[in-house]
Every structure is written in structure tokens, then in C-alpha cells.
């Protein structure tokens, strides 16, 4: 079912006729309803909460995606087991409903004056660089035409062990903690990252005004 949903999103993205796009989206709704019978809502939160975790959250910014948890030190190994499973492969369960949550956040941002000012500022500072031309939330057309295949491709390319780091603080035995991390993450293979394109911005030599 997930593969079928993924294919439907690709079909929806490629279709130019608005009526046909609506028909495809109705099919996505239908198949997603069927797929939801095999998914557990908030599965990760439930698993983490069972360890006594608190403060579970995440944020994304220009150069980082950060996942946060407060874990009791006696549950560290169980937490690592869960994270190893999560970072070993991605399954986009309940993608349809999660997309709606992102839409809501995107819509709220359109009425947030501080965000709108920041968008204009970054656009003026970086007319060529993605930091100025691509907001963290993306553009409306991105959300209207999502691609599960593109998300999987991004995960496979960037969610690799040589591109992320653990930051652990608290009442920890350093040597034992490193041993546990090696146990669960040490076997994940190194993967070359996609090449970076160097973007050179021209110096700002005059006042830039936006209204």
C-alpha cells in the first residue's frame, strides 16, 4: 500500500490537469485510509514515552535537523535500539496526515510578521544561495506536490552515519556510553555525500530596501 501511495503522489505531481489531480488525490485519500489500518499513530512517541522520556522534540533549520530527548540513563540502551531502527530505514506511515500538519505550520508562518521580515532579510542577503532562496518550510507548490520518493532519496543520501552526530550530556559513564553507541551504530556503513555546489554571492555595495 505504501508503494502504491508513493506512486500516486508521483502521478499527482506530474499531472498538469487540475481536475485529474483532484481525482488522483481522492485516490490517495482512499488508499491512505486503508493503509492507516496497519499503522500505529504516534508510534515513536509511545515507544520513547515508555522509557520515561520527556522533552521529545525536533527542529529543522538551514544546516541542521536536530532530534531531542531527555532519557533516564538506565534506559540508554533501549533508546539506542529504537534510534538504530529509526535511522536504519525510513517508513512513511501516515504520510498523508503528517503532510497536513506541515501545511498547518506553513499557513501559520504566512501570518507571522517576524518570519515574513526574516524571509525578506535572507532573500536580500542571499539572492543566489539556498539560505535566502529556500525557507525551511519550503514553498506552497512543494507542499501541493509532495514526493515520497524524493523524501526517501534525501534520507538515503543524508541520513548516513558520517553526516550526523550524537550529543549526549548528563549522568553518563563515558566509556560505557561509547561502547553502546558503537554496538548499535558502529556497523552502519559509510556513505559518500552528494557533492556541494559552491555558490558565491556578490558583495552588497548599496542599501537594499524592501517594503
Predicted regions and their residues:
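Helix N-cap motif at beta-to-alpha junctions
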Residues: 72-75, 170-175
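M16/insulysin-pitrilysin zinc metalloprotease superfamily fold
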Residues: 69-99
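Acidic helix-start/capping segments at beta-turn-to-alpha-helix junctions
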Residues: 100-105, 202
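Divalent metal-coordination and catalytic microenvironments
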Residues: 67, 83, 102, 151, ...
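A common structural junction motif
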Residues: 85-92, 184-192
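Hydrophobic face of alpha-helices
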Residues: 41, 80, 96-99, 118, ...
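Non-catalytic beta-strand/loop surface segments
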Residues: 1-74, 108-163, 187-211
Amino acid at each position: 500500500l505504501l508503494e502504491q501511495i508513493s506512486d500516486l503522489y508521483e502521478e499527482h505531481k506530474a499531472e498538469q490537469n487540475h481536475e485529474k489531480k483532484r481525482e488522483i488525490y481522492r485516490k490517495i485519500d482512499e488508499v491512505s485510509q486503508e493503509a492507516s489500518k496497519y499503522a500505529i499513530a504516534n508510534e515513536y512517541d509511545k515507544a520513547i514515552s515508555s522509557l520515561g522520556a520527556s522533552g521529545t522534540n525536533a527542529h529543522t533549520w538551514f544546516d541542521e535537523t536536530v532530534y531531542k530527548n531527555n532519557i533516564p540513563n538506565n534506559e540508554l540502551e533501549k533508546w539506542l535500539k529504537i534510534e538504530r531502527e529509526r535511522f536504519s530505514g525510513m517508513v512513511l506511515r501516515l504520510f498523508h496526515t503528517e503532510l497536513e500538519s506541515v501545511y498547518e505550520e506553513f499557513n501559520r508562518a504566512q501570518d507571522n510578521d517576524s518570519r515574513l521580515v526574516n524571509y525578506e532579510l535572507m532573500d536580500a542577503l542571499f539572492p543566489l544561495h539556498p539560505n535566502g532562496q529556500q525557507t525551511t518550510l519550503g514553498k506552497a507548490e512543494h507542499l501541493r506536490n509532495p514526493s515520497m520518493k524524493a523524501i526517501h532519496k534525501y534520507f538515503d543520501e543524508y541520513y548516513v552515519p558520517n553526516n550526523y552526530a550524537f550529543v549526549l550530556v548528563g549522568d553518563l559513564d563515558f566509556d560505557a556510553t561509547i561502547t553502546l553507541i558503537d554496538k548499535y551504530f558502529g556497523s552502519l556503513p559509510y556513505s559518500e555525500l552528494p557533492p556541494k555546489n559552491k555558490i558565491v554571492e556578490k558583495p552588497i555595495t548599496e542599501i537594499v530596501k524592501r517594503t
